[in-house]
Amino acid sequence: MRAPLLCAVLLLLFVGGAAAADTNRYSYLSVDRVAINLSGTEATVVVDYRVDPGIAPLVAIFGRGDLHQKVRRVTGFEDGRIVALSMERAELVVEEAAMDYGEGSYWFPAHTFGVVVPSLTISTPQSTRQLARTDTFSRGIGYFGVPPTPPAA
């Protein structure tokens, strides 16, 4: 049992080094797109990716703990809570991703990703920004929260 596990670990190490040539790759993940939806101070991050076909069976057999770490690293949200994870997509919730400036105004600061993201979408209640082939969201974005609905009379 130790020999196959050792072979799998060594294979993962070699794949990580070979993957460095592709800018949207990190180890055995190739990122296709990232969508960030901002609401209040919370961000919901959806990342679509591909797992190398040779590694996919190993991830399925040995568990997805390493995949969790890699998804957090490529998104740059190491403290994000993964709420859904598959071999093609992950959804993270990041608490306190934006700063609350009071009176319903928020600021999502500049952010750096662990890879070059081919397609990045950042949505607020007021607007959507789309960027292509970037590893940073360099300017940040200000927005207003959705006003609470008044109670029915």
Regions found by a protein language model. Name each.
Residues 1-22, 47:
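Secretory targeting signatures
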Residues 18-153:
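Lumenal/extracellular ectodomains and adaptor appendage modules
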